[in-house]
Amino acid sequence: SEMIVDEGDPFSKLLVNKSINNLKGRNIFGNVEHKILPGSSEDLKVIEITVEEKATGEIMAGAGIGTDGTSFSFAVKENNWLGRGVKLQSEVNVTEHKISGNISVNNPNYNYSGNSVFVALDVSSTDRSGTTGFSSSKTGFSLGTSFEQYENVFFSPRIDVAFEDIEVDSAASDQIKKMEGNFFNTDFSYGITVDKRDQVFKPTAGYRATFFQTLPIIQDSSSILNGLDMSTYHDFSEDLIGSFKFFAKSIHGIDEDVRLSNRLFIPSKKLRGFSTYR
């Protein structure tokens, strides 16, 4: 599905370059080269593609010290599981206040349809009894897909199911004590993406904008999440590519306050040098 051009299509150098770029973006080949050769007649071309295999598995381990204290992480990733281009990833993160782990499987070309299908399992345990006076444990399951609805317009629906247990200390504030209990959620989330980048792999021009929303289907403490993520790219010179990125999220409780674990904070990868949860 990464090849935009097919046998018998009118020749387009632009579409050939996009196809090669898509192959590089899959991150399962060490090198991808192509040649455009003359065909049996003047109006025919032969495209010869040469790929170099590489190890598609990755193991990552890390440790750090920052404004949130000490953190450790370990991840295993496979970009070509079973030789079918399926992405398999598992990750464990440990900080002073939270332990989280997840495993996800993403088939970017499910049943040769060109549509992506993914499934994920997330488990986390948070202990903030020494600061805000609560601790929580959460187990969640996600199932979703992503496909190109119109040219350069992608739709990504998903279903999230989660169970969470929140315990509150007796010394916590009255506002936090109201959040104690067991919660079961079933949410419907979707994203609409407009992708006008010149290429998926190392873009040099264009933009990518995504609007995403989460709506409660079955939820003990209902809230609606809205977000916008935008990236633009511009090539100032052959060796200098500039980018501008905008990210915003908001969450609104429907009938009561937003649950403690659902409240929003700026991700550390978006704003560095500050303590999270502040």
What are these regions (language model features)?
Residues I4, D9-T210, S223, Y233-H234, ...:
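Gram-negative/organellar outer-membrane beta-barrel architecture
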Residues D127, L215-Q219:
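A generic structural motif
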Residues Q213-L215, A248:
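Short, structured patches in soluble enzyme cores that scaffold and shape functional sites
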Residues G227:
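A penicillin-recognizing enzyme superfamily signal
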Residues M230, F246:
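Charged catalytic cores and adjacent phosphate/nucleic-acid-binding surfaces used
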Residues D239-F244, E256-R263:
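Electropositive nucleic-acid-contacting surfaces
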Residues F247-G253:
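Short edge-strand/loop segments of extracellular domains
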